[in-house]
């Protein structure tokens, strides 16, 4: 459920991990000393070799698909800046802050880049791996010059002065506004029909990377589960999860909530300590070649009182049935909103309604290179499911002041229905298969 950005906000664990365990120059996570790890973590083996990178040919196919969608949506070009859509179509990892770096991809003709002059070396290094990167059209601008005029000039040279430009949804307003003023005859609109139109439908390679990410996440969670003990804080657990990911060859983290704080879907900064019978909720995932996992497991350490245990198990069973119901409802042609409704009905019929009272959020979100991306399992969303769409499936029941239980796995739509990339959690006491 929790996005990578949101995780950094709500959990002090992530920030500490990022400082304590920097990446090596190769991009591989620094592996901890096995002797300092609990046995369940020390025995983990790296799975990094199983992750096959996305190729230039695949990115070229994506650009051709984008051009087709531009034609279908009457767009003359799309403008991409730093972020996952730029990486999706080119493989470029870019950060630039307030200085604009952009790719303009026309429906017809050659793409061009606009880049700060002092960043030209870094830009050419990355562009060389992108489709058409051998001889790119790269337009630079000095610190006292306008990058927007470079965009306008590139459009003019391609006969697109009065064209319709799709702006990717994460582009900052100041950049979009600058382009609009420099190219006043152009019409600016959303690029989402093109960018999401490509990204919502995953290739077999993308699904394989996501499936590996999910398997790695469950392996990390299970190893940490066997190392839990009374007296640990949520930060202790988070540190172990980060260490487990490094053992497995990847970088990841988790938001960890204990006891009554598990009733807050996105958690709390309040210091929390695991006690006998505590519910522990672990949520988030890892990155495998740019593709994300997002899994939640809720478990109990030791034995709660009979009364509390009975209530917890009853709630777990309801949430489990809700997840099963949404999985059964999902298939090509079904609207996203109907999948949310299937899970919500189970929870409401079991007495945890009405509506959003205890199941306080939508059922799920699209998954891929972003932890949260289009489309969404939410009431009113009429987007129809298609094969190879991927989503989180994460019903939950949250009882303020007591506990919350959420189960989250990644769902992929198949030609005949849907399946989870990992098996459902069997129970609170035995959360792993």
Label the model's feature ranges.
Residues 2-433:
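Active-site neighborhoods and metal-handling regions in enzymes and metal-associated proteins
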């Amino acid at each position: 459920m929790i996005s990578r950005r949101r995780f950094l906000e709500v959990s002090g664990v992530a920030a500490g991990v990022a400082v304590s365990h920097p990446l090596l120059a190769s991009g591989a996570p620094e592996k901890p000393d096995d002797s300092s790890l609990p046995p369940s973590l020390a025995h983990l083996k790296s799975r990094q070799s199983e992750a096959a990178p996305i190729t230039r040919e695949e990115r070229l196919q994506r650009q051709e698909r984008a051009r087709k969608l531009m034609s279908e949506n009457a767009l003359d070009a799309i403008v991409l800046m730093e972020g996952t859509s730029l990486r999706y179509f080119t493989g470029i990892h870019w950060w630039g802050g307030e200085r604009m770096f952009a790719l303009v991809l026309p429906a017809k003709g050659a793409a061009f880049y606009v880049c700060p002059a002092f960043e030209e070396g870094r830009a050419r290094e990355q562009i060389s791996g992108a489709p058409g990167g051998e001889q790119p059209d790269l337009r630079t601008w000095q610190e006292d010059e306008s990058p927007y005029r470079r965009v306008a000039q590139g459009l003019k040279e391609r006969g697109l002065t009065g064209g319709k430009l799709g702006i990717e949804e994460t582009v900052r307003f100041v950049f979009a506004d600058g382009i609009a003023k420099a190219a006043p005859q152009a019409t600016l609109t959303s690029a989402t029909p093109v960018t999401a139109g490509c990204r919502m439908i995953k290739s077999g390679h993308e699904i394989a990377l996501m499936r590996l990410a999910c398997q790695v996440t469950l392996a990390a969670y299970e190893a940490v589960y066997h190392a839990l003990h009374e007296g640990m804080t949520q930060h202790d657990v988070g540190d172990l999860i980060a260490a487990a990911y490094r053992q497995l060859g990847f970088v990841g983290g988790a938001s960890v909530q204990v006891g009554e704080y598990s009733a807050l879907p996105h958690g709390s900064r309040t210091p929390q300590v695991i006690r006998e019978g505590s519910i522990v909720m672990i949520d988030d995932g890892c990155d495998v070649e740019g593709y994300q996992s997002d899994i939640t497991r809720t478990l109990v350490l030791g034995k709660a009182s009979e009364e509390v245990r009975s209530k917890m198990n009853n709630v777990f069973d309801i949430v489990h049935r809700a997840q099963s119901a949404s999985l059964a409802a999902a298939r090509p042609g079904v609207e996203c909103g109907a999948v949310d409704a299937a899970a919500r009905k189970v929870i409401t019929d079991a007495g945890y309604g009405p509506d959003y009272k205890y199941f306080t959020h939508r059922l799920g979100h699209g998954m891929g290179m972003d932890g949260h991306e289009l489309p969404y399992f939410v009431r009113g969303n009429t987007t129809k499911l298609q094969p190879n769409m991927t989503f989180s499936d994460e019903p939950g029941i949250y009882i303020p002041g007591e506990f919350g239980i959420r189960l989250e796995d990644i769902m992929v739509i198949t030609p005949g229905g849907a399946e989870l990339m990992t098996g459902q959690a069997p129970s609170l006491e035995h959360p792993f298969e």
